[in-house]
Amino acid sequence: MLRKSKKQPQTVAEKVSKLLAHPNESDSAEDSDFDVATGPRLVDFEEEEYDLPDARSTDFRKRNVKLLSEQSDRYKGKISSRKELDDDEDKDDEQEVSYEESDEDDENLTNFKQKLNAGGAEDSEEETAAGHSESGEESEEIESNLTDFKKKFEAGDFKYDDDEEEDDDSEEEDHSQESEGDDDDSEDDEAEDDAIKPSDVMSKTNHQAEIQKGLAVQNQLRIWERLLELRINTQKFTSKANQLPAPETLTKLASESDELQSVLNEAQERSSKLLQQLLSLQSALHQQYSEMKKSVKRKQPTEDSGPAVKKFGSVLQSNFQQMIGYRNEVLLKWDDRTKLLTPGAGVKRKSLQEDYDIIKKIGSALANREALVEKSQTPKNSQAEQQENTPVQRLKHIYDDSDFYHQQLRELIEYKASTSSNMSEITKQFVELQKLRQKMKKKVDTRASKGRKLRYVVHNKLINFMAPNESSDWTDASKSELYKSLFV
């Protein structure tokens, strides 16, 4: 059994009266549920639960932010002393005193007006009480003079205020014009700063440092020329040494002749003395150069029992092993610097081998060591061992590097031909170098980021590979009937 609702139904009159008394309320449960379901839901805000995000600036922004003084000259400060600061304070005090005096002057003017008005009234009362002792014309003149004076005074005061306002307006206009002029000047200055000329860049550099770099480069070139000159002078006796017989035949001839033995001993002593001097020079250079002294750790050579030639060989081998690390660092450093000056440095390489550094290139060149040694032990056409009809033979007791020697000579000739003291040619080379550097710079469109510029690729036109659809009114039956009628 369902229970009957205890709530009695309301009449129409009761509903209308309730709506008139409370128009915003609804008595039905359905309306209230509808309002709850469709009405806006509000959540209480609690400050403790809500945490603001961390809006601190990053280190990158701090480093790249520009001060106002760097952006425009208007915001640059001026260095002042304490004396100037005290003078400014005294000027401010004087201005305050002048303002106070002007207030006192205004009060005096008002008092003077009141006295004039009071004096005029008293004079008129005395004249009437005396029974018109003076003539009416004089009294009228006095009154007219007083009224004229009052009018002139008031008119003069009004004009003075107008002049002040006009002066203030003119000063404001002048100030606005000056500020606009300053803005224009600042914009012009900023535009001039943005358009930096190459001469300005060259003038801002440290000339003394550039001079020192130029002198260092000249010293390096002189050292290279002296070493190449030494190599040219040694070419004569190296070619003569390669013409000597093999060591076995030379020892056999020396055993037969005492004079030849003494000559060989003297040559060995002189060559060993020369080699000793070169090693001492190398150690002195290591001690003199601080960077090499830190990078190259010298080891004391072990005393080997044996002939002097073997001792020299072990010392040279140990020195070479110690210098490998420093040599690679120097080669990589200068190879990276010279890559920027070579033409076509910014162009993509066709092969992966061209992207190798200088160390990998040297390693790949020395990979086939046996072939290189055989090439250096093969006599060339300029030597006497090789005759016209005899085949080329490998002689292990000689060392021929004429290919490398001729390459060095070609480099020396090209360097002497390219270098000149004429300033016009030097400026032309400098301009060509600047053009080359500008070409190597990658042109980047700064406005194309963040989706501000659409990037698209134009596709080729569509090609239709379908068979053509014939639009003909003839049916197959009519076509076959036509073909049959042709061969009747």
Swiss-Prot record:
Assigned GO CC terms: nucleolus; nucleus
Keywords for the protein's UniProt record, in alphabetical order: Nucleus, Phosphoprotein
Highest rank taxon of the organism: Eukaryota
Biased composition (Basic and acidic residues): 71-85, 148-159
Region (Disordered): 71-206, 290-309
Compositionally biased residues, Acidic residues: 86-108, 160-193
One annotated GO biological process: oogenesis
Subcellular location: Nucleus
PTM sites of type Phosphoserine: 26, 28, 32
Family recorded in the similarity comment: Belongs to the AATF family.
The protein's role, per its UniProt record: May function as a general inhibitor of the histone deacetylase HDAC1.
Protein name: Protein Aatf
Native source organism of the sequence: Drosophila melanogaster (Fruit fly)
